[in-house]
Curated annotation (Swiss-Prot):
This is UDP-N-acetylglucosamine transporter. Belongs to the nucleotide-sugar transporter family. SLC35A subfamily. It comes from the Eukaryota. Pfam families: Nuc_sug_transp. It comes from Rattus norvegicus. It is a multi-pass membrane protein.
Amino acid sequence: MSANLKYLSLGILVFQTTSLVLTMRYSRTLKEEGPRYLSSTAVVVAEFLKIMACIFLVYKDSKCSVRTLNRVLHDEILNKPMETLKLAIPSGIYTLQNNLLYVALSNLDAATYQVTYQLKILTTALFSVSMLGKKLGMYQWLSLVILMAGVAFVQWPSDSQELNSKDLSTGSQFVGLMAVLIACFSSGFAGVYFEKILKETKQSVWIRNIQLGFFGSIFGLMGVYVYDGELVSKNGFFQGYNQLTWIVVVLQALGGLVIAAVIKYADNILKGFATSLSIILSTIISYFWLQDFVPTSVFFLGAILVIAATFLYGYDPKPAGNPTKA
């Protein structure tokens, strides 16, 4: 059953990540009259939606009893303040990471951003080894190297992308690069920290997500006030929101739930591989839908390497002797 949940959650993550990349790219490049929606408010709204979804799931687990729901929330959150406070650290880092990625996408071309952001897989592996004591075998370390090479091939910029990158100033490229590098390290640390909390305590993944979303909303609102306070007071919190914006926000909220399930039933490194597969899928779809990418032989080589690395990571050679030895 756990194996089925593992691959089901990974499959949903690939779908969610692919859809989010395509819709977010389209929403940020679509030319419209009036102000564009603020990314800082989108992060906050996504956190609120995630909290609402998790409360509903806890309600469902409580046999649709409001009284049981209130008791569970009171016992697991209010009566365990130290357990709740544990989520403040990863929540703050996740909020910072979400805002950094908007900064990165505003200052880097898509190819450079996506290649560089895959460094989070390596940082996740290193934090998993150091914080969780996870043992990676030779095949798993090799798969990480192959994955990095494959993603680099997949996102190798074409001539048109190189020309577009020249339009970006050196300063903005440096800002974008620093943003995505910090996001890579924060993603690795926060993801492994959250995994450690989930697997060492008995609280459900939905309760943990409510706690995570609570702090995320607070940190997110602080970010809105500091960076976009004037714009919000002038044009409103939901300025620039349209149907596409709400799709992006819902997909972001869904992503938090799916990632939590992946961390619970799989692990952070498999989450990274699923994200890499979604990059290939989103690039292919963008060729047919957005028509802004032409696949090359280098792309197909990279796709093969990423898929091979995914299977290699899951390869578990059985020892010839001492089968009962831990």
